[in-house]
Amino acid sequence: MRGIYLVGTDTEIGKTVISAALVYILCKAGYKTAYFKAALSDAEELNGKLIPGDTEFVCSLSGIQEDYEKLTPYIYKTAVSPYLASKIENKPIDIQVIKDKLTKLENEYGYVLCEGSGGVICPITDVDNKIYTLGNLIKDMKMDVILVCRAGLGTINHTVLTVSYLKNNGIEVKGIIVNQYEENRLCKDNINMIKKMTGIPILGVMPYINENKKNFIEELKYNACNIFKADEIAGLMKEV
């Protein structure tokens, strides 16, 4: 079983879009791949049941047919971080449950792509003044990371600091994916500086796609197939 964690440098940078793109090309190429997101907030309620939008989107795009609760153990309605939502809704997160669910997926599928719930330093739990972060989970599960960053203003600082934190905590960054790229001098220079300052390979550059466009899904699939190579992504996944 092979897996990898996809982590973002900031909020609203399109981790789920990139996750969906990667899972889509892996499944399309014949790799039996699952998607996993430990906790999700801001879920919509439908017929008395919470629907994890990110998980629904990835499954819809890639064709994965699984119960959402199997892929996302903790689902919250409140539109704050999953950690805070768990406190507000009095539904605590159990780290062991997350680990067990992920291990079960790893045993059922050949490949698992995990999407981080927030950034690498974001807390998942705070029990008895012991803060457990996404980074702790990644390290405990012995996984490597693909880092997603935005192309625009501010990305150099966010990306270099995140890479530094991951390296200092013994987590290997296998590559960087630049999202929301626009054809201008700023974005080009940002990518060049990120390569120079981190020494991490750029796995792909995804152009900005308006999610409200009528043909958003078709455009995302087209770009995914033209930007990423399934064999390369699968090869980055560490045996766990």
Curated annotation (Swiss-Prot):
Instruction: State its Enzyme Commission number(s).
Output: 6.3.3.3
Reaction catalysis annotation: (7R,8S)-7,8-diammoniononanoate + CO2 + ATP = (4R,5S)-dethiobiotin + ADP + phosphate + 3 H(+)
Q: Which molecular function GO terms apply here?
A: ATP binding; dethiobiotin synthase activity; magnesium ion binding
Compartment(s) of residence: Cytoplasm
Which SUPFAM superfamilies did the record assign? P-loop containing nucleoside triphosphate hydrolases
| Biochemical pathway | Cofactor biosynthesis; biotin biosynthesis; biotin from 7,8-diaminononanoate: step 1/2
NCBIfam families the UniProt entry points to: bioD
Query: What is the name attached to this protein's record?
Result: ATP-dependent dethiobiotin synthetase BioD
